[in-house]
A protein has these predicted regions:
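Class I S-adenosyl-L-methionine
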Residues: 1-122, 235
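A contiguous loop/helix-start segment that scaffolds small-molecule binding in enzyme catalytic cores
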Residues: 2-3, 7, 16-18, 76, ...
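Short secondary-structure boundary/capping segments
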Residues: 10-11, 36, 58, 83, ...
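Short hydrophobic alpha-helical segments that form membrane-spanning helices or hydrophobic packing faces
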Residues: 31-33, 130-133, 187-188
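Short, solvent-exposed amphipathic alpha-helical segments in soluble enzyme
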Residues: 34-38, 60-63, 108-111, 137, ...
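Short gly/pro/ser/thr-enriched loop/turn and capping motifs at secondary-structure boundaries
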Residues: 53-54, 74-75, 126-130, 147-150, ...
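Class I SAM-dependent methyltransferase SAM-binding "motif I" and its flanking Rossmann-like core
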Residues: 98-171, 215-216
Length: 277
């Protein structure tokens, strides 16, 4: 098991280690408090400058080394991290979104562990969460949909056969489709095998950035709208019965909050708290 940076961290200081931090979708105020603290204390910051806005670096110390990694290979990035930590420096590796999704965390973690470099992972808000918040939409609407699938369509990197988009779409869950704008015709065809053509979906571009745009269109228009807006990257698709459910007054609600349901923290017939004074 890789050593955690916190296992060797002196009080009130960052130890020489790598801190892999999720920056969130783009808005500087959507990074976690822990992530912001690590950024403000690090000796070195390696950030994906093609996906992370420079505003997120506002609190980085002036003397800290800042390295954009958009033009670097994974091997070069790992070499930099290992070199700086062995030079007794603390390193923040700043990723867009959440490190657990499409971030090369697996490869970086293995390489750091092999080099006996301690590292810590700090989660971030993902684009699907930020998009749902902008849409004021819950993706798990009672009696409508209770599962969320995060996936992508096969492109340069193939997905396993069991995870082909058509197979996942058969569940008709809330499906969050990443990294697929360049293959949108194929994606739409696979989705139409299982979802209604007139079901509203959301096309989300540069979620969390100042130029964020979100369009809601019928599924049958997903590819056409993508081409009209010339979207080829930083695009997320939300395909979910929940989007339509939020525009309907069908009475769907959670059993947990019904007055007739009691549990450990809310006995039945619990009175509503009164306003103080």
């Amino acid at each position: 098991m890789p050593q955690s940076a916190t296992d060797v961290q002196p009080q009130n200081a960052l130890s020489p280690a790598v801190y892999i931090v999720g920056a969130g979708p783009g808005a500087p105020d959507l990074i976690t408090v822990r992530g912001q603290r690590l950024l403000s204390q690090a000796d070195v910051v390696l950030y994906a400058n093609s996906l992370v806005p420079t505003e997120l670096l506002a609190d980085v110390r002036p003397e800290a080394e800042q390295i954009g990694t958009a033009n670097l290979t994974l091997e070069q990035i790992v070499e930099l991290m290992v070199d700086r930590v062995r030079s007794q420096q603390s390193v923040v590796r700043l990723h867009d979104g959440d490190p657990s999704l499409y971030s090369a965390l697996y490869e970086q973690g293995r390489a750091l562990a092999a080099a006996e470099i301690p590292f810590e992972v700090v989660p971030g808000v993902s684009a699907f969460q930020a998009a749902a918040a902008t849409l004021q939409t819950e993706l798990t609407v009672p009696q409508q949909v209770q599962s969320i699938i995060l996936t992508r369509i096969s492109g340069r990197t193939q997905v396993p056969d069991a995870e082909e988009l058509g197979a996942l779409a058969a569940h008709r869950a809330s499906l969050c489709l990443y990294l697929s704008a360049r293959h949108v015709e194929n994606a739409q065809a696979r989705l139409l095998e299982h979802y209604p053509a007139d079901m509203l979906i959301a096309i989300c571009y540069r979620v969390g950035w100042p130029d964020e745009k979100i369009w809601q269109v019928p599924l049958a228009q997903m590819a056409a709208k993508t081409h009209t807006e010339r979207l080829i990257r930083t695009t997320l698709y939300l395909i979910s019965p929940a989007l339509a459910a939020h525009q309907q007054a069908d009475g769907s609600r959670s059993q947990l909050y019904r007055p007739s349901h009691s549990h450990l923290f809310r006995p039945q017939n619990q009175p509503t708290p009164r306003k103080p004074g």
